[in-house]
């Protein structure tokens, strides 16, 4: 008699679940996935598509998207061999984790953090060392360093600015961790364009154990294009490239990236709008009874309410979709809402006042 197919699978699958988005992905006012509220203008889309039409669709793209990598390297002011492009930063996370994590390897993750970190560590049979954030959801840098040294961790993942908590480490704090800890450090800078803190990309040549992760899904408004990057020194890059899926990024992504970077004022204008709205929303939310708002360094806000499940449902019924993040450590009865257009934010405020 044959074994049940489950007995033939990776046993780690019993400890993880498929990714899902509570409430779906469609709503009149969609504020649940930290996307930009601004799509690319039609004139730029037309220009991108005109270029893509001239590409051969019957041929594979490059093994790695070398033209996109060179474009982004030039934008950052780093050598092309220090950059690798992926089909979204999630794919890059899979690649980096496969290169850095294995059975028995210790992975330090401040909690709460992006849920995919834990999932990948478990899937690759790593041992997670959790370090809680402070009660105000800021990083406890001393605790991170102490745990890394005590547990002799191999890999440290820092979401800074943090998703879902919304706060950042300073440039000096990240450098302190990288310089002190005997581990590879991944700094996930998905929200860096919204942050008051400086990127640590400038440290990649100084520290051979640092990797920086970037996404084009947030500030650059390209979530539908799936474009991510890792930046590190060439020696480490040669190693993390080994498990990378070949042909994963097509020419459309490369062409889109080049055109958006050539018209970067679209990004800076959108970021200024979002930051101004974030400041207004912080003030407005602070005036609503029963709502506690946390300081943010991203394009989203964390609020604590009396009953997150009930408020989430009432907002959903009112046409506004946010993210219930109550399941994360330290975030009981918390909701996450990204900054939308003025009218979308006003709709959220109106509903919260009636909850």
From Swiss-Prot:
Its EC number is 2.6.1.9. Signal peptide: none annotated. Its cofactor is pyridoxal 5'-phosphate. The modification N6-(pyridoxal phosphate)lysine is found at residue 218. Disulfide bonds: none annotated. It is an enzyme of class 2 (transferase). InterPro entries: Aminotrans_II_pyridoxalP_BS (IPR001917), Aminotransferase_I/II_large (IPR004839), HisP_aminotrans (IPR005861), HistidinolP_aminotransfase (IPR050106), PyrdxlP-dep_Trfase (IPR015424), PyrdxlP-dep_Trfase_major (IPR015421), PyrdxlP-dep_Trfase_small (IPR015422). Pathway: Amino-acid biosynthesis; L-histidine biosynthesis; L-histidine from 5-phospho-alpha-D-ribose 1-diphosphate: step 7/9. It catalyses: L-histidinol phosphate + 2-oxoglutarate = 3-(imidazol-4-yl)-2-oxopropyl phosphate + L-glutamate. It comes from the Bacteria. GO terms for biological process: L-histidine biosynthetic process. Keywords: Amino-acid biosynthesis, Aminotransferase, Histidine biosynthesis, Pyridoxal phosphate, Transferase. One of its GO terms (molecular function) is histidinol-phosphate transaminase activity. Belongs to the class-II pyridoxal-phosphate-dependent aminotransferase family. Histidinol-phosphate aminotransferase subfamily. Homodimer. This is Histidinol-phosphate aminotransferase. It comes from Chlorobaculum parvum (strain DSM 263 / NCIMB 8327).
């Amino acid at each position: 008699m044959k074994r049940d197919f489950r007995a033939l699978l990776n046993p780690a699958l019993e400890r993880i679940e498929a990714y899902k988005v509570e409430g779906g992905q469609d709503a009149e006012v969609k504020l649940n996935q930290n996307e930009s509220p601004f799509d690319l203008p039609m004139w730029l889309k037309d220009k991108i598509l005109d270029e893509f039409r001239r590409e051969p669709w019957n041929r594979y793209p490059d093994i790695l998207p070398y033209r996109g990598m060179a474009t982004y390297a030039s934008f950052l002011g780093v050598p092309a061999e220090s950059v690798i492009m992926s089909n979204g930063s999630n794919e890059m996370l899979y690649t980096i984790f496969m290169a850095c994590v294995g059975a028995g390897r210790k992975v330090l993750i401040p909690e709460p953090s992006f849920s995919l970190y834990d999932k990948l560590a478990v899937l690759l049979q790593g041992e997670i060392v959790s370090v809680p954030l402070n009660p105000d959801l800021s990083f406890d840098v001393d605790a991170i360093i102490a745990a890394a040294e005590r547990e002799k961790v191999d890999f440290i993942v820092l979401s800074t600015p943090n998703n879902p908590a919304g706060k950042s480490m300073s440039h000096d704090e990240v450098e302190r961790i990288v310089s002190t800890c005997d581990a590879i450090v991944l700094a996930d800078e998905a929200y860096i364009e919204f942050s008051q803190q400086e990127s640590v990309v400038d440290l990649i040549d100084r520290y051979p154990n640092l990797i920086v992760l970037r996404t084009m899904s947030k500030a650059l408004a390209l979530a539908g294009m799936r474009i991510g990057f890792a930046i590190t020194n060439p020696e480490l890059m040669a190693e993390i490239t080994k498990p990378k899926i070949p042909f994963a990024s097509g020419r459309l992504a490369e062409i889109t990236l080049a055109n958006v970077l050539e018209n970067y004022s679209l990004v800076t204008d959108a970021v200024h709008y979002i930051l101004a709205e974030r400041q207004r929303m912080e003030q407005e939310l602070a005036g609503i009874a029963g709502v506690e708002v946390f300081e943010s360094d991203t394009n989203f806000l964390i609020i604590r309410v009396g009953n997150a499940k009930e408020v989430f449902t009432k907002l959903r019924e009112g046409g506004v979709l946010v993210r219930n993040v109550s399941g994360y450590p330290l975030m009981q009865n918390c909701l996450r809402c990204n900054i939308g257009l003025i009218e979308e934010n006003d709709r959220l405020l109106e509903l919260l006042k009636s909850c």
